[in-house]
From Swiss-Prot:
The keyword Methyltransferase applies. Belongs to the methyltransferase superfamily. RsmI family. It is found in: Cytoplasm. Catalyzes the 2'-O-methylation of the ribose of cytidine 1402 (C1402) in 16S rRNA. In vitro, active on the assembled 30S subunit, but not naked 16S rRNA or 70S ribosomes. GO terms for cellular component: cytoplasm. This is Ribosomal RNA small subunit methyltransferase I. It catalyses: cytidine(1402) in 16S rRNA + S-adenosyl-L-methionine = 2'-O-methylcytidine(1402) in 16S rRNA + S-adenosyl-L-homocysteine + H(+).
């Protein structure tokens, strides 16, 4: 379905409003103005947001919108927008929709022609990336890793060869297990940055090969407390890495030709080193 934003002034607007991830001084002037002006604020946790609004002296009507009710309540909020009410969407901390509720509401509004107005602001993933010292021109945000070890390892194996910098959120009680799984799947030399309690009093940003990082975290239980972001170095292509299409060609040729000849032809077709393909084929056989 095509999505467009309405210029109909009789309809309200949905504002996507980031809130601080720790330091309350990080809220923007524009965010405060919007929160003060809207008719309704849709919040992940109305008690938490109520305290934030109280701190800034803002009196506003709050509407609970969370993972368990979003699909049902999206239509309720859409009706209010169509009546001309302006609504702000906030999460407990950071930018809404980034690992927080809001997707169904935003999509519902866009499909109905309601204008969605995004405000820039705090985001733990981007804040951590900016200080990690890892390539930031291309990165991949993965949210939380699965809760159980098998799921985590399967997820890590699926992105093992991903060259982009990887960003994960992690919880205090799973940090050690996740780091151990990263060591097991990606290897202890993969560089990882742990950013915890960003913008807060005990903010810590520490990077090291993940085997060393795991040992560092184990040394002090305080190092695994708080809100966590893991920034993982992307896979670095090695000279011996072989493209998947070259390996498929090699397998087809091996069925009809001697191994050495098959490796030579596959190498010529794909522009890779003959010896590397030949070595790979020998390893597969033995």
């Amino acid at each position: 379905m095509k999505q467009h934003q309405s210029a109909d002034n009789s309809q309200g607007q949905l504002y996507i409003v980031p809130t601080p991830i720790g330091n309350l001084a990080d809220i923007t002037q524009r965010a405060l103005e919007v929160l003060q002006a809207v008719d309704l604020i849709a919040a992940e946790d109305t008690r938490h947001t109520g305290l934030l609004l109280q701190h800034f002296g803002i009196n506003a009507r709050l509407f609970a919108l969370h993972d368990h009710n979003e699909q049902q309540k999206a239509e309720t909020l859409l009706a209010k927008l169509q009546e001309g009410q302006n609504i702000a969407l906030v999460s407990d901390a950071g930018t809404p929709l980034i690992n927080d509720p809001g997707y169904h509401l935003v999509r519902t509004c866009r499909e109905a022609g309601i204008r969605v107005v995004p405000l820039p602001g705090p985001c733990a993933a981007i804040t951590a990336l900016s200080a990690a010292g890892l390539p930031s021109d291309r990165f991949c945000y993965e949210g939380f890793l699965p809760a159980k070890s098998k799921g985590r390892r399967d997820a890590l194996k699926a992105i093992e060869a991903e060259p982009r910098t990887l960003i994960f959120y992690e919880s205090t009680h799973r940090l050690l297990d996740s780091l151990e799984d990263i060591v097991a799947v990606l290897g202890e030399s993969r560089y990882v940055v742990l950013a915890r309690e960003l913008t807060k009093t005990w903010e810590t940003i520490h990077g090291a090969p993940v085997g060393e990082l795991l040992a560092w975290v184990k040394e002090d239980e305080n190092r695994r407390k708080g809100e966590m972001v893991l920034i993982v170095e992307g896979h670095k292509a090695q000279e011996e890495d072989l493209p998947a299409d070259a390996l498929r060609t090699l397998a087809l040729l091996q069925a009809e030709l001697p191994l050495k000849k098959a490796a030579a032809l596959a190498a010529e077709i794909h522009g890779v080193k003959k010896n590397a393909l030949y070595k790979y084929a020998l390893e597969q056989q033995g």
